[in-house]
């Protein structure tokens, strides 16, 4: 894969930034694509742009505001509370988001001569999002190949690892401090360790604490 090109679906968060570093190591050329769907905090787009610029990665931002018109939710509406009731999809789930993002990433990838698409979706820390499942990604990969008669390969480096292992991967890639200090995971738009209270921050912190304990134990 070292001679090939990849497009990374990039939000500027922990997972997609780890995937960006993974792609940089795996491929000869990497581009990043970020989607503006009127998310709760526009800082996410700014954060992604800054990271891409710092890493020297060509970065494209695509307007997906139509998604907010079709599927208003807690990620795009400040007047909706972030909730997750047992047996129901989280209020942060955006219908069709990964379906559309990966489809548009594929269109871009073909235009720039890339076969490979990298995304940070994950089943292990499954948050109730059906479009983060491996079966969905594999199905969409086949559909995209058929729809454009092009041999795409969708890579999901985080699919079977948890948040602690994602921190470990960033460390192995030499990006641990970068990811910890410069990425935006927080639903409230606070870069780095975030607000510490929203579900995204809690999941991120739990994984970080577990990994740091494991790393300290391994060094003793």
Swiss-Prot record:
Note accompanying the cofactor annotation: Binds 1 zinc ion per subunit.
Residues holding Zn(2+): 186, 195, 198, 201
Pfam families the UniProt entry points to: QueC (PF06508)
Molecular-function annotations in GO: ATP binding; ligase activity, forming carbon-nitrogen bonds; zinc ion binding
Pathway stated in the Swiss-Prot or TrEMBL entry? Purine metabolism; 7-cyano-7-deazaguanine biosynthesis
Name the cofactor(s): Zn(2+)
What is this enzyme's EC? Answer: 6.3.4.20
Q: Which InterPro entries match?
A: QueC, Rossmann-like_a/b/a_fold
- Which Gene Ontology BP annotations are present? queuosine biosynthetic process
Domain of life where this protein originates: Bacteria
Q: Where are the transmembrane segments?
A: none
Keywords for this entry?
ATP-binding, Ligase, Metal-binding, Nucleotide-binding, Queuosine biosynthesis, Zinc
Which positions bind ATP? 10-20
Q: Which family does it belong to?
A: Belongs to the QueC family.
Q: What does this protein do?
A: Catalyzes the ATP-dependent conversion of 7-carboxy-7-deazaguanine (CDG) to 7-cyano-7-deazaguanine (preQ(0)).
Protein name in UniProt? 7-cyano-7-deazaguanine synthase
Species source reads: Bacillus cereus (strain G9842)
Q: What is the lineage of its organism?
A: Bacteria, Bacillati, Bacillota, Bacilli, Bacillales
């Amino acid at each position: 894969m070292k001679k090939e090109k990849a497009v990374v679906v990039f939000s500027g968060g922990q997972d997609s930034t780890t995937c960006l570093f993974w792609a940089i190591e795996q491929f000869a050329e990497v581009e990043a694509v970020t989607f503006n769907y009127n998310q709760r905090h526009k800082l996410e787009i700014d954060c992604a742009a800054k990271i891409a610029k710092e890493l020297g990665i060509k970065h494209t931002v695509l307007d997906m505001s139509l998604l907010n018109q079709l599927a208003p939710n807690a990620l795009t509406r400040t007047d909706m509370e972030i909730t997750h009731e047992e047996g129901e999809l989280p209020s942060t789930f955006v219908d069709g988001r990964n379906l559309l993002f990966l489809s548009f990433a594929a269109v871009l990838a073909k235009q720039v001569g890339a076969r490979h698409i990298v995304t940070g979706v994950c089943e292990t820390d499954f948050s109730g999002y059906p479009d983060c499942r491996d079966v969905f990604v594999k199905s969409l990969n086949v559909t995209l190949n058929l729809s454009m008669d092009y041999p795409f390969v969708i890579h999901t480096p985080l699919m079977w690892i948890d948040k602690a292992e994602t921190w470990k991967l960033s460390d192995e890639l030499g990006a641990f401090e970068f990811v910890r200090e410069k990425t935006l995971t927080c639903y409230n738009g606070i870069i780095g360790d975030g607000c510490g209270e929203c579900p995204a921050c809690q999941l991120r912190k739990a994984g970080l604490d577990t990994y740091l304990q494991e790393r300290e134990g391994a060094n003793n």
